[in-house]
């Protein structure tokens, strides 16, 4: 009987470790500024990944210098490539739906995130983006580097005030 109980506890321990171990991302220590849900393989809360500013800044950062319809001239944006964020959360799907604080939504194919350097920007010209100025995140396409991206469809996908991404 004692051996059976010991074996049962050991099996439960392994099963519990597998479930907890699957959630390899840390919990946010600060204010959550981005939530990723949907078809993801990593988790901090079983169904979603919640990220604070420090977690975002710990990912590989990239700069994109480009022009867009909302700025005069070129601006330098710093942030995380959307494909790097999707890799971080182990996304597996075909599309991402990005949502803004004002409930505006747009979709971008995951194939496009792999093909183009689509940036989830949190800084413009060295200054953190605030909610008043398109923050916390602004989707920036490399319009100056890839001229064929200068379309109404891509302009509509250049969503700002992003706070949620759902992988579909």
Feature locations, PLM:
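N-terminal intrinsically disordered, low-complexity segments enriched in P/E/S/T
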Residues: 21-168
């Amino acid at each position: 009987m004692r051996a059976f109980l010991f074996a049962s506890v050991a099996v439960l321990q392994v099963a519990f470790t597998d479930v907890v171990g699957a959630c390899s991302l840390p919990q946010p220590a600060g204010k959550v500024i981005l939530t990723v849900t949907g078809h993801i393989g990593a988790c901090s809360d079983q169904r979603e990944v919640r990220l604070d500013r420090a977690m975002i800044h710990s990912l590989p950062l990239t700069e994109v210098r480009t022009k867009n319809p909302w700025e005069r001239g070129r601006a330098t944006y710093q942030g995380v490539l959307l494909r790097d964020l999707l890799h971080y959360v182990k996304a597996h799907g075909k599309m991402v739906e990005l949502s803004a604080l004002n409930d505006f939504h747009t979709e971008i194919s995951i194939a496009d995130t792999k093909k183009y350097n689509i940036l989830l920007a949190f800084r413009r010209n060295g200054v953190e983006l605030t909610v008043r100025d398109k923050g916390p995140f602004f989707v920036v396409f490399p319009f100056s580097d890839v001229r064929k991206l200068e379309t109404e469809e891509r302009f509509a996908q250049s969503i700002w005030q992003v706070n949620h991404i759902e992988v579909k």
